């Protein structure tokens, strides 16, 4: 909402926040809706969204609680309900009280049904069945725990990829995010003055470097020192958080990656999700190059 206001004798335009209830109704965990809602709401800088999350809604009794909540706190409804009877009751109720409802999976389901030539089975929570993908994610998580921060380097060639970088360059959170997608990611710290980690001497998996702006890295490291009980006023002049030392450390790591032919991702302004997506693109490119090599090349 825009309002006019006066400041130093001039008219200015002031943007005020718009408050809105948003109901997320799911017959499973609600993870899909949460992701969609976050992605869309993030495009509105001045919105103040009050989320009402309704998960595991699979019976009429459970749905009636939702309808009472929507009536008490009116606002648009996003739904991933599959069962036709529940969908119809939700739609009719929202229509009566003038509330918009969107079944967010419908456009994708319609598209796939048309191209596949098969009707969707309409069963809630199918993405959470304990299938091979589920167990692959669990296996990847165990792998990351065993190979985090340079541990068990002898097993690096069992990984799908290896992340390298200086301390606090987001190797660990990126590895765990990838594990949640079923990707086994080892990660090894690069430390100036120490011998090259043995796991990196002749890796047969893609190795990807992570780097970061020195000022941002120093801020992360200072925060880390606070969390582990360090005293920033004493530690701030050490090499760990000294600007020139950190710059030299990052340059050294970049040169090592360049010498080894490892691609480098700057994570300074990237979310973990964006970094992971770029990592997977680089891994795919690595495999494409390998496939294009002649036998024995």
Curated annotation (Swiss-Prot):
Swiss-Prot/TrEMBL keywords: Kinase, Nucleotide-binding, Serine/threonine-protein kinase, Transferase
EC annotation from Swiss-Prot or TrEMBL: 2.7.11.32, 2.7.4.27
Matching InterPro entries: Kinase-pyrophosphorylase, PPDK_reg
Pfam families recorded: Kinase-PPPase (PF03618)
Top-rank EC class of the record's enzyme: transferase
GO terms of molecular function: ADP binding; ATP binding; phosphotransferase activity, phosphate group as acceptor; protein serine/threonine kinase activity
UniProt entry tagged with the keyword Ribonucleoprotein: no
Binding site for ADP: 165-172
Catalysed reaction, written as an equation: N(tele)-phospho-L-histidyl/L-threonyl-[pyruvate, phosphate dikinase] + ADP = N(tele)-phospho-L-histidyl/O-phospho-L-threonyl-[pyruvate, phosphate dikinase] + AMP + H(+); N(tele)-phospho-L-histidyl/O-phospho-L-threonyl-[pyruvate, phosphate dikinase] + phosphate + H(+) = N(tele)-phospho-L-histidyl/L-threonyl-[pyruvate, phosphate dikinase] + diphosphate
Function: Bifunctional serine/threonine kinase and phosphorylase involved in the regulation of the pyruvate, phosphate dikinase (PPDK) by catalyzing its phosphorylation/dephosphorylation.
Protein name: Putative pyruvate, phosphate dikinase regulatory protein
């Amino acid at each position: 909402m825009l309002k006019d206001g006066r400041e130093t004798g001039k008219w200015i335009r002031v943007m005020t926040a718009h408050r809105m209830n948003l109901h997320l109704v799911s017959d499973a965990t609600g993870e899909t809706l949460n992701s969609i809602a976050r992605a869309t709401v993030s495009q509105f800088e001045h919105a103040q969204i009050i989320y009402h999350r309704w998960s595991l809604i699979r019976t009429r009794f459970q749905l009636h609680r939702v309808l009472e909540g929507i009536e008490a706190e009116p606002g648009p409804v996003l739904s991933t309900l599959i069962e036709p009877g529940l969908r119809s009751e939700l739609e009719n109720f929202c229509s009566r009280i003038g509330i918009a409802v969107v079944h967010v999976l419908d456009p994708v389901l319609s598209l796939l049904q048309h191209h596949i030539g098969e009707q969707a089975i309409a069963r809630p929570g199918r993405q959470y069945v304990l299938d091979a993908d589920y167990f692959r994610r669990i296996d990847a998580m165990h792998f990351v725990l065993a190979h985090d921060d340079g541990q068990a380097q002898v097993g690096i060639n069992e990984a799908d990829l290896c992340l390298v970088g200086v301390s606090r360059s987001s190797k660990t959170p990126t590895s765990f995010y990838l594990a949640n997608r079923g990707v086994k990611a080892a990660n090894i710290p690069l430390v100036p003055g120490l011998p090259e980690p043995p796991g990196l001497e002749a890796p047969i998996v893609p190795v990807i470097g992570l780097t970061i702006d020195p000022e941002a890295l120093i801020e992360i490291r200072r925060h880390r020192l606070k969390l582990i009980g360090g005293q920033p006023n004493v530690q701030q002049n050490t090499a760990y958080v000294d600007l020139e030392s950190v710059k030299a450390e990052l340059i050294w790591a970049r040169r090592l990656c360049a010498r080894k032919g490892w691609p480098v991702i700057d994570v300074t302004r990237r979310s973990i999700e964006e970094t992971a997506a770029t990592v997977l693109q680089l891994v795919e490119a690595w495999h494409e190059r390998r496939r294009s090599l002649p036998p024995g090349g």
